[in-house]
Each structure stands twice: as C-alpha cells, then as structure tokens.
C-alpha cells in the first residue's frame, strides 16, 4: 500500500515576481520610494509588500516560525552614511532593533494557516547621520541583506531551513533632510568636442539655517591624483576622462571640499568640467562620458 506523508514545509514568495522558494538565497529588485517619518527616520523597505509565506501542512498540526538572524542589516556602503532600524509591524506596541543586528532576534512571526499567503510584517528604516544629504543610494546598489531562519513546532521532523534575502535598488535615492537642499539631484553637462571646455556645472546649495557645508566627489577614477574620472562610455575614447575643478584647482575624489557658511541664498559649488588626459593610454577617438556623485555634509 502506498501513501504520502504530509508536507511540513514553509513556502515563501517574492510578491513582485511570483517566484516561490523554501530555502536558500533570493534576490529582490526594489524601486525605493523613501518616506520621511515624524522622527526623521526614512522608511526604505516594507517587507510586507515584498515577501509572503504560507504553511504547507494540510493537517493543521504544525506551526512554522520565522526569525531574523545576527548580521542582518543594510549594506556596508549605506552604513557609512546612515544607521538602520528594523520594526516588526505586527506587534501592537512595536518592536524595533537597530541594524545591523548584533544577535539573533527572539521575536518570531508565526505561519499556521495552510495554503494562505501571509505578508512578512516588517519594515526597514534609515536614519541619516547628521549632516548627510544628497544621493545616498545608486541604481543597482545592494540595499540590505536579511538572514532568516525557519523552525517548526514539530522540530526537526518538519525541517529547519535558512534563507538569505537580498534587496537591490532599481533607482537612485536622494535624501533631502529639510535643512539643506541642492538645486538639482541630476545635472547633465555637455562638453564641446575635444579639447574644448571647461563648462560650468550649474549646481547650488542653500540651507534653511546658516550651516557650514562641504561636499565630496565620488565615482570611478583613473590615473594618479584621483582627479580624473574614468570614461564609462561604451566604445569610448581612450586616454581621456573628465575632471571637475573649482577656483583652487582640480577636485580629487573622496576629499571634502568646504563651501564655508551657507544660508538661505543659493551658493554655487563653482565647479567646471573639462577633459583631462589619464596618462595611462594613448589618446584615441570616441565618446566621453563620466558619472560623478556629489555628497554634501553640514554641521
């Protein structure tokens, strides 16, 4: 006589794609629409919109539980500009822990209804470090990684499983804290044919209250001195990149540049864009394109 054993598995689903999984690594692509909360935190990920799970025990005798494990948190790149928080939204009084987690959470979420998809009730928040504004997240960046453990009332009979959920941004995210603002989140500068230039970069900043403001450039660089940003154009010109300069000269990547005291009147960064030789290859014809990030800080 043949018979089948009931399944004690927990099945989860990527709500965006419909992909189902019961363990292992899963990636989520998220269009991030940050919402500033009353406590100045920024809501980044609502897991209830992204992940659902269901109990697969048709007998109703086995409850599954999920808990989030040590090491879960935002990506290291975000940790340098912000700190994070995880909230379980199903708790009446709330349950919050700072990220990255330093220990496995004892709070669990139960899944006991057979065949019923239940959203995972948690949200991830960012708290920008004081003085940080500008672009914080780039399209394609890893936002956060959650390590999740599934266990059951039937113990090992029902199987213990581990998940790794990785969330990637599908858009750029800018933070405007309400204290200082930039004139544009995206500035396109068209250079004339080589060797023409330089061309003014129309970018200003202003603050609600007078602050000491500085900015830092970042992006792929080439050559010595970190002042020539790499040409990222497909089939682009060789031996040449883009350089941003102010009245003091070329601005290196990764080194803060002070704008002094900035108040309610817009202050220009005073930047000009020009071509610059990399010194690493012969000059060859082609397109030139560089993407340069500007991050502001104030105190």
Curated annotation (Swiss-Prot):
SUPFAM superfamilies: Bacterial adhesins. Fimbriae (also called pili), polar filaments radiating from the surface of the bacterium to a length of 0.5-1.5 micrometers and numbering 100-300 per cell, enable bacteria to colonize the epithelium of specific host organs. A minor fimbrial subunit. This protein is necessary for full expression of S-specific binding. S-fimbrial adhesins enable pathogenic E.coli causing urinary-tract infections or newborn meningitis to attach to glycoproteins terminating with alpha-sialic acid-(2-3)-beta-Gal. One of its GO terms (cellular component) is pilus. This is S-fimbrial protein subunit SfaH. InterPro entries: Adhesion_dom_fimbrial, Adhesion_dom_fimbrial_sf, Adhesion_dom_sf, Bact_Fimbrial_Adh_Pro, FimH_man-bd. PANTHER family: FIMBRIAL SUBUNIT ELFA-RELATED (PTHR33420), TYPE 1 FIMBRIN D-MANNOSE SPECIFIC ADHESIN (PTHR33420:SF14). Disruption phenotype: Deletion decreases hemagglutination and fimbriation levels. Its main location: other. It holds the Pfam family Fimbrial. Gene3D superfamilies: Fimbrial-type adhesion domain (2.60.40.1090). GO terms for biological process: cell adhesion involved in single-species biofilm formation. Keywords: Fimbrium. It comes from Escherichia coli O6:K15:H31 (strain 536 / UPEC). Coiled coil: none annotated. Belongs to the fimbrial protein family. It comes from the Bacteria. The keyword Protein biosynthesis does not apply. It is found in: Fimbrium.
